[in-house]
Amino acid sequence: MRGMKYSLLAGAVLTLGALAGCSGFSYFVANVPASFGSFHRTRDLAYGSEARQRLDVYAPKDTAIHPLVVFFHGGSWTMGRKSQYAFMGAALATRGYITVIPDYRLYPEVRFPNFVEDSARAVAWVREHAQELRGDPDRIVLMGHSAGAHMAAMLALNSDYLERAGVPSYSIVGLVGLSGPYALDPNSDTLRTIFAVPYTEDDWRPVHFVTNRAPPTLLLHGLNDDVVSPTHTEKLRDALLSHGASVETHLYPGRGHADTAASFTLVARSRTPALQQTLAFLGRVTAQNDARTVAMNRRGMPGMTVRVPLTDSK
C-alpha cells in the first residue's frame, strides 16, 4: 500500500507536471514537503519595482557562509511562478546551498530580452545582498529548468547581461541546465512574437555565445522530451567542448521534459539521478573559495556525456 501511494503521488507530478500543463494539484503534491524541513524561507523580496520582480530565498538554518544558487523557473516565457518550484529551494537549501528563485516579467507584458534582463537584475540583487543572506558573492551558480535553463545559460554565456547589471563574470562559478532550449528556433506564432525583430537567432541562442570562458556546466535532459528536444542539450554540449570548456552531460533514456525537475521532489526522486548529479557538480564548482582562481582555470577541464540506465524504485 505504501509503495502504491508513492507511485500515485509520483505519477501525479510526472503526468500533470509537464512544462506548459503544470496543474495546481501536481505542484501542490510536489511542494507539500517544501513546507517543512531544516531551512529558512523568505518570500517576495523585491529586486525591482515591477510586480513580478520579486524573489524567494531558501537558506540553511546554520550561520555559516554558503554558496548561492539562483534558479529560474520555466513556463515558455509566458507562464510560471517562483512558488511552483519551492521543492527546488527546499532540496538545495537542506543540502547547504542558499537558493534564490526569482519571478520575472513574462509575455505579453514584455518580450525578449526583457525577461533575461530581469534575470540579470535578480542575480545582481543576490550578489549585492549576499552578506545579509550569509552567502558568498563570488560563488554563484546559475540554474534553471526549460525556459529558465535558457535564461540561466544566456546569463552565464553572454556576459553582457550580468556586466550591465554590475555582476562580474568571475562570480559565476557554474551553470546547471535542466531540459533547456539552448538552440532556440521559435516555432509558433507566440514564440515568434516573443523573440521578434530587431533581434535574431544570434541574439537569443545561448549556443551562439559559447567561448572558452564559459563556466563549468552541467546539462541534464530526458531523451523522451517532446517539449524541448534533447538535441538542444547536445548542441550546447558540443559547442562547449569545441571551445575547450568544462561540461558534464547526462541524458536519461525513457524520461521526459518534467522529469529532470521532478527528480528534485521527494515524491519523484527516483525518476532520475539528477539531484545526486547536481549536488556532486555543485560541490566541485563551489569548493574553491577563490572564485577568481576558478574562473582562470576553466579552460581544459574534461567533458563527459552519460546516458544513464534507469530503474524505478519499487
Q: Where are the regions that the model predicts?
A:
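N-terminal cap/lid segment of alpha/beta-hydrolase-fold proteins
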Residues: G24-T63
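Short beta-strand element of the alpha/beta-hydrolase
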Residues: I65-G75
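C-terminal catalytic histidine-bearing segment of alpha/beta-hydrolase fold enzymes
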Residues: E234, L241-K314
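Primarily recognizes the serine-hydrolase "nucleophile elbow" in alpha/beta-hydrolase
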Residues: R121-T190, D202
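Catalytic nucleophile-loop/oxyanion-hole region of alpha/beta-hydrolase
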Residues: G80-Q84, M88, V100-P137, V267-R269
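Mobile cap/lid helix-loop segments that gate and shape the active-site cleft of serine hydrolases
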Residues: A34, E50, G177-F209, P215
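Conserved alpha/beta-hydrolase "acid-adjacent" motif
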Residues: D226-K235
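Short beta-strand/loop motif that positions the catalytic acidic residue
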Residues: L219-H221, D225
